[in-house]
């Protein structure tokens, strides 16, 4: 795994503000490889990857976050899913031509930002905001302003790094239930906004923080690796087939002689023939008998 694919948490000793810094290269490339995405779509997936990593780092529980853009433009949907272990996957779907250099609004059109938080234990939460900002970072800040009520700023950069294509970002957020000065927070945000793409992508986290906040006392914690990992499996696809009406499954078998289950996230294919389907039904019947 690339040394670059890491998420760092940090705290300001004299301000009730926390920060997160993430840089990704290999993970981003693994998400877009095998897909013929135009450059603007690759870039928005990189930015979504950075945003999802930063948001999952705010989780206080085991679970995952999905950050999705959807609209009526040529980019119908772009989504990244990540969990508290910083395991990421993502995909985009297009419904028209996307020109080189297209902006977020030109790609999505009239659309929404949907953030779904799914704890392993407890209820799922979903927040939806209209895409009113010109950038993904601006749209995410709008989401935080409407839902969390915690002052939050995001800074996302992408471009060519020393080791190839890279993306990175920084999240600043006032700590909850603490008396934080908004002036102090805005001052730290102004400092953070000066980060250059090449600095964020190529320098170690310690050096980035020193360049931004050398007059502040900052505690930098151990990094967490960010990686690509798809949760699909033959077993999971089999469970999906079990939920379908038997006559629908039989019709698919008659038409093609097999059922091909394709994972859009990683490109894996899982093929089931009549023998496989019979085995799935036998297993399902055995499980039902054990339950009763």
Swiss-Prot record:
Record PTM text: Under oxidizing conditions two disulfide bonds are formed involving the reactive cysteines. Under reducing conditions zinc is bound to the reactive cysteines and the protein is inactive.
Location in or out of the cell: Cytoplasm
Single GO molecular function: protein folding chaperone
Disulfide partners: 230-232, 263-266
GO BP terms, alphabetized: protein refolding
Taxonomy, superkingdom: Bacteria
Location (main, coarse): cytoplasm
SUPFAM superfamilies (alphabetical): Hsp33 domain, HSP33 redox switch-like
Keyword field: Chaperone, Cytoplasm, Disulfide bond, Redox-active center, Stress response, Zinc
CDD domains, per the entry: Hsp33
Cellular component, GO annotation: cytoplasm
Pfam families registered for this protein in UniProt: HSP33
Family (UniProt): Belongs to the HSP33 family.
HAMAP family noted in UniProt: HslO
Described purpose of this protein according to its UniProt entry: Redox regulated molecular chaperone. Protects both thermally unfolding and oxidatively damaged proteins from irreversible aggregation. Plays an important role in the bacterial defense system toward oxidative stress.
NCBIfam families reported in the protein's UniProt record: PRK00114.1
Protein's name according to its UniProt entry: 33 kDa chaperonin
């Amino acid at each position: 795994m690339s040394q670059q694919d890491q998420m760092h948490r940090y705290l300001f000793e004299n301000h009730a503000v926390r920060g997160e810094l993430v840089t990704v290269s290999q993970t981003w490339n693994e998400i877009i490889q095998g897909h013929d995405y135009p450059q603007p779509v690759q870039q928005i997936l990189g930015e979504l990857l950075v945003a999802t990593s930063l948001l999952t780092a705010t989780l206080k529980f085991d679970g995952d976050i999905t950050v999705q853009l959807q609209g009526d433009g040529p980019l119908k949907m772009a989504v990244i899913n990540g969990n508290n272990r910083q395991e990421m996957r993502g995909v985009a779907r297009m419904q028209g031509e996307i020109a080189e250099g297209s902006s977020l609004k030109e790609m999505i059109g009239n659309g929404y930002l949907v953030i779904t938080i799914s704890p392993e234990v407890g209820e799922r939460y979903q927040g939806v905001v209209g895409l009113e900002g010109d950038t993904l970072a601006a749209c995410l800040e709008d989401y935080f302003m409407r839902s969390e009520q915690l002052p939050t700023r995001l800074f996302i950069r992408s471009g060519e790094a020393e080791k190839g294509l890279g993306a990175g970002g920084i999240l600043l957020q006032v700590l909850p239930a603490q008396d934080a000065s908004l002036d102090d927070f805005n001052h730290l945000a102004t400092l953070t906004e000066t980060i250059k793409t090449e600095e964020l992508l190529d320098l170690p986290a310690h050096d980035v923080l020193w360049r931004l906040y050398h007059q502040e006392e900052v505690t930098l914690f151990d990094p967490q690796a960010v990686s690509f990992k798809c949760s699909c499996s033959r077993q999971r696809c089999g469970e999906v087939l079990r939920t379908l009406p038997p006559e629908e499954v039989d019709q698919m078998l008659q038409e093609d002689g097999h059922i091909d289950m394709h994972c859009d996230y990683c490109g894996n294919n899982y093929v089931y023939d009549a023998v496989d389907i019979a085995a799935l039904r036998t297993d399902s019947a055995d499980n039902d008998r054990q339950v009763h």
